[in-house]
Curated annotation (Swiss-Prot):
It is found in: Cytoplasm. The lineage of its organism: Bacteria, Bacillati, Bacillota, Clostridia, Eubacteriales. Keywords: Amino-acid biosynthesis, Arginine biosynthesis, Cytoplasm, DNA-binding, Repressor, Transcription, Transcription regulation. NCBIfam families: argR_whole. InterPro entries: Arg_repress, Arg_repress_C, Arg_repress_C_sf, Arg_repress_DNA-bd, WH-like_DNA-bd_sf, WH_DNA-bd_sf. SUPFAM superfamilies: C-terminal domain of arginine repressor, Winged helix' DNA-binding domain. GO terms for molecular function: arginine binding; DNA binding; DNA-binding transcription factor activity. HAMAP family: Arg_repressor. This is Arginine repressor. It comes from Desulfitobacterium hafniense (strain Y51). GO terms for cellular component: cytoplasm. Regulates arginine biosynthesis genes. Gene3D superfamilies: 3.30.1360.40, Winged helix-like DNA-binding domain superfamily/Winged helix DNA-binding domain (1.10.10.10).
Length: 150
């Protein structure tokens, strides 16, 4: 019974967007399985299912390795919104302060975004230094960051 139920869970996860354990439990009940949320929770853990982002504020269950990751622009937008505390500049530099532990991942996303004016980033634990060339492009870089954070 457990094996059949877990096969059905995998089938459901692969064919539908499931946001919560309760949604999954309801679909299993409709398919003839007598389950509780606790049973579904144990199955999810045993199967190693993960929650992956589907949009800015939404997640769904997925089998590891099958979910399409967010594109770099979407990931950058999300990271900027969720982790940036302040944005400052001086001369040809833009300095982003982040929640501790987030600077390196955000800097990598900025690097992979290939912003023409940003010739490099340096990141610590909670600070990112963006080197901008020419210096006159600093306002446009700040504006781009502000738009992405909206």
């Amino acid at each position: 019974m457990k094996t059949r139920r877990q096969m059905k869970i995998q089938e459901i996860i692969n064919n539908q967007v499931i946001h919560t354990q309760e949604e999954l439990a309801e679909l299993l009940r409709k398919a003839g399985f007598d389950v509780t949320q606790a049973t579904v929770s144990r199955d999810i853990k045993e199967m190693g299912l993960i929650k992956v982002p589907t949009s800015e504020d939404d997640y769904r269950y997925a089998v590891p390795g099958t979910a399409q990751p967010l594109s770099t622009p979407d990931r950058l937008k999300r990271r900027l919104r969720e982790t940036v505390v302040t944005v400052n500049d001086s001369e040809n530099l833009v300095v982003l302060r982040t929640i501790p532990g987030n600077a390196q991942a955000l800097a990598s996303l900025i690097d992979h975004s290939n912003w023409e004016e940003v010739i490099g980033t340096v990141a610590g634990d909670d600070t990112i230094l963006l080197v901008v060339k020419p210096a006159g492009a600093v306002p446009s870089v700040r504006e781009r960051i502000a738009k992405l954070m909206q």
